[in-house]
Amino acid sequence: MELLRPALPSYFLLTLLSIWTAASEARAVSTGMPTISAASFLQNLMHRYGEGDSLTLQQLKALLNHLDVGVGRGNISQPVQGPRNLSTCFSSGELFAAHNLSHQSQIGEREFQEFCPTILQQLDSRACSSENQENEENEQTEEGRPSSVEVWGYGLLCVTVISLCSLLGASVVPFMKKTFYKRLLLYFIALAIGTLYSNALFQLIPEAFGFNPMEDYYVSKSAVVFGGFYLFFFTEKILKMLLKQKNEHHHGHSHYTSETLPSQKDQEEGVTEKLQNGDLDHMIPQHCSGELDGKTPVVDEKVIVGSLSVQDLQASQSACHWLKGVRYSDIGTLAWMITLSDGLHNFIDGLAIGASFTVSVFQGISTSVAILCEEFPHELGDFVILLNAGMSLQQALFFNFLSACCCYVGLGFGILAGSHFSANWIFALAGGMFLYISLADMFPEMNEVSQEDERKGSALIPFVIQNLGLLTGFGIMLVLTMYSGHIQIG
């Protein structure tokens, strides 16, 4: 009996506690206070984020965003090779794909209960915290970059192809007076404008800001930017053609006013444009064939380019002096200016190519395509200028190719800078350069070529060729950007 006495007070306390608990529950029922059940938590979430007893995929995504779950940068269009670590932060698309959910899916209570462990695991692993997100993005960037062999191999290949374009100038010299040459050159200039401008809008400038076309959805806005440029170009050309026809109808073709005649200053400033566009009618001596017939022509002409004056070299020996060797001291200053500026231009091109290949092989090839489309007409124009500045055919080929080889030096610097530093600054520099070259350099050149063709015939054909070139370049860059996540190279 003595052993049972200490237990009596404890038993008495438990009895009182049970009675108090039962009384509290009875009082709660009598006063109308709701009792908490497990289903009430689920119903509360369904009513807060959904409509009725179901959730759409967008509503479920809103819940995930509120919890900072599913904010990873994974891409379901590029499946990960091998098993994925569950401690990483998945994107909402990857989580939905794991549960076989599509945009048309309706998530009921049962489906939501099956999805809840996924949310709980991501919260427990803290994989989507800001610190882990930064580390994971850095690791994925390093893993996604091409190897050194791929960077140097593809880079050297693309630069070699681009540099070989400098040797194509000699092949078109016999056709420079043909009509189809002018129109072919017009198409390539328009193609270069379209590719350079679109490459800057779709890839280089967004890449400089760290945007991803598969995730940031900027492609449509960049396309609208090009659309604004093209709309004003198209409208201006149409208005000019209509006004030209109206003026011709009222004034005819037999009289010219003093306003329509170009001044001497305008003629001198336009010579450089004519050289770049392949207009050699006023530069190539018409008696060149006399040299080949054994005659010795006498030439006393000057080539005026801006403020520079270049004598026709070796006039007592040959009017077609580029077919023979010329002393370097007799070559005009313009030739060396063109060679040096072209070398600097090619160096920056190589810099952009090298930095692009350090990010991805696809990015590098895309940038190389834009530069290739620009280099072809550009090198042809430079080749013509070198010939008419006093160089022989062999010298023009050599120095044009030498300046093109500066692209290799730029490639090396671009690869080294992109591998050890952020390539975004190089992309920003290249994007600005591409915009300037396309709009301030090549666009007036395209207008000059088209005006020469318009004076000889209808303005409709040059206008159609310009549109084809611009839209082709735009289409190439648009397709490459939109399908960049589906194209695997290397």
UniProtKB/Swiss-Prot annotation:
**XEXPHE-motif: where is this motif?**
374-379
**Membrane topology, Extracellular segments:** 29-155, 206-222, 417-422, 481-490
Q: Where is this motif: HHHGHXHX-motif?
A: 249-256
Q: What does the record say about its membrane topology?
A: Multi-pass membrane protein
Query: What InterPro entries would the database entry show?
Result: ZIP, ZIP_Transporter
Reaction(s) catalysed by this chain's protein: Zn(2+)(out) + 2 hydrogencarbonate(out) = Zn(2+)(in) + 2 hydrogencarbonate(in); Mn(2+)(out) + 2 hydrogencarbonate(out) = Mn(2+)(in) + 2 hydrogencarbonate(in); Fe(2+)(out) + 2 hydrogencarbonate(out) = Fe(2+)(in) + 2 hydrogencarbonate(in); Cd(2+)(out) + 2 hydrogencarbonate(out) = Cd(2+)(in) + 2 hydrogencarbonate(in)
Sequence intervals crossing the membrane = 156-176, 185-205, 223-243, 396-416, 423-443, 460-480
* Cellular component annotations (GO), alphabetically ordered: apical plasma membrane; basolateral plasma membrane; early endosome membrane; late endosome membrane; lysosomal membrane; plasma membrane
Query: Superkingdom of the source?
Result: Eukaryota
Q: Where in or outside the cell?
A: Cell membrane; Apical cell membrane; Basolateral cell membrane; Early endosome membrane
Classification via Pfam families: Zip
Q: PANTHER family under this entry? A: METAL CATION SYMPORTER ZIP14, SOLUTE CARRIER FAMILY 39
Query: What family does the entry list?
Result: Belongs to the ZIP transporter (TC 2.A.5) family.
Role of this protein = Electroneutral transporter of the plasma membrane mediating the cellular uptake of the divalent metal cations zinc, manganese and iron that are important for tissue homeostasis, metabolism, development and immunity. Functions as an energy-dependent symporter, transporting through the membranes an electroneutral complex composed of a divalent metal cation and two bicarbonate anions. Beside these endogenous cellular substrates, can also import cadmium a non-essential metal which is cytotoxic and carcinogenic.
Quaternary structure and interacting proteins, as annotated: Homotrimer.
UniProt protein name: Metal cation symporter ZIP14
Protein source organism: Bos taurus
Q: Give the lineage.
A: Eukaryota, Metazoa, Chordata, Craniata, Vertebrata
Q: Which gene encodes it?
A: SLC39A14
